[in-house]
């Protein structure tokens, strides 16, 4: 005689509840705890940026670039060199200064050449030659500064104060003066900075 067990809906629901509760128990279930939050480490680049290289510059406290040169620095005044300030990047064996007039009646005229200027930053007062500098004869054969002196009626002349960065010690051709010396300096330079002043003829 076969006996058939008939479960009521209520009994079935009760059994399901017991199974569900058993799965949430402490002994038989997966009770692993969530690990504590650990913030991700941030990597900071501690490398100090290299300082910017000092630029090659030249200026004068007596006149701005493109402005008139005061009379005291011309042949109509005391005819002394204007005060200058300059800076240069590392890597120079020496600096050189050339002052010329491309508007001269007879063609380019070199007024002043100074070689052997100490690299770095520097300045001069009125009438001074840059530290360590040696004057080379200009277009007139004069060793030293000769200021603006354009003939009357020749209009505006532009006087270029050009500072050259020389990577190796300068070797001028024997007897080089004026334009020839200025050209040799320009060819040997690895950089230049320029200040231009004007003077009326």
Swiss-Prot record:
Fragments of the mature protein (residues 77-96, 97-116 and 117-136) prevent uptake of M.tuberculosis by a human macrophage-like cell line. It is found in: Cell membrane; Cell surface. This is Putative lipoprotein LppC. It is a lipid-anchor. Transmembrane segments: none annotated. A lipid is attached at residue 24 (N-palmitoyl cysteine). Probably involved in bacterial recognition and uptake by its host (human). Belongs to the UPF0098 family. A lipid is attached at residue 24 (S-diacylglycerol cysteine). Residues 1-23 form the signal peptide. Keywords: Cell membrane, Lipoprotein, Membrane, Palmitate, Signal. Coiled coil: none annotated. GO terms for cellular component: cell surface; extracellular region; peptidoglycan-based cell wall; plasma membrane. Residues 122-141 are annotated as: Disordered. Residues 77-96, 97-116, 117-136 are annotated as: Prevents bacterial uptake by a human macrophage-like cell line.
